[in-house]
Amino acid sequence: MTSEKGAPYSEAYVWIWLPGATQPVVAGLLSQQGGALAFNYGRSYLARPDAIAIYAPELPLRPGALALLPGLSMPSCIRDASPDAWGRRVLINRKLGMTGGDAPQLELDELTYLLDSGSDRIGALDFQQSATQYVPRHTQKPTLEELLTAAEKVERGMPLSPELDQALLHGTSLGGARPKVLLEDGERKFIAKFSASHDLYSVVKAEFIAMRLADEVGLDVAPVHLRKALGKDVLLIERFDRVWSDGHWHRRAMVSALTMFELDEMMAAYASYEKLAEIIRHRFVNPKATLRELFSRIVFNILCGNTDDHARNHAAFWDGHQ
């Protein structure tokens, strides 16, 4: 794929929000090397007294190009910040003007997904073409009705007006396969999940009920709200990777369980609860409480019939050390 100026992307500067910071700094460079993407930290970043590793088990804080883990084509902790199925579909629609039936056959390269998606992505990273100037890719604040209309058009493979196209940009960096966008309401930020056109029942309402039940039985889950837009259910999930403090937003770094497993999507079948429990015992700040939470979630998922409990759907905060 190509940049806005027509030339292929060959690199992306990785910007990071350090713990407690309200503005990002450049951490390093992600560059194309053959069929893979390699990362190296910048000298100025390594010289900072407050520098932290993006994720030390994979990208330790040291100079030079960092070798990829076996089987990976890019650092998994950076892939965590990239769009997933829905965000990629929106970007394909945006860049190529695909039709509905063409969507599964079309793909963009990873640098395009990183550099053309919205900046308010999960975790504490973003990606820019510049090493000196940070320009966030944000949008105006559309209504839920406008966002739902745009999402439905993408699902049907229909072209978007410039206004609707811009409205969906904000949610392109999100993971997951279902239609979703990002919303901000004062001192809270939300992920809004929409019904899909092929749903046989209100899946988002079922998810709302499941999350409320999880909260009732003592699991640590995000606050959720159910709203209506154009007569359809919309699930609002409060974001836990953003903290509003002293008039500013702070970002919390996160890594997925897939990254902790040192796997990618092609190898996700090798992930297991047993391996995750072992990682928790050795690396987490409070392993006993975390293991109890993990076991409780496993039991709850079985009881409520959740079959979407894959490794990308588990994540942990990263403070630069643990």
Protein language model features and the residues they cover:
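Phosphate/dinucleotide-binding and metal-coordinating scaffold of catalytic cores
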Residues: 1-311, 315-322
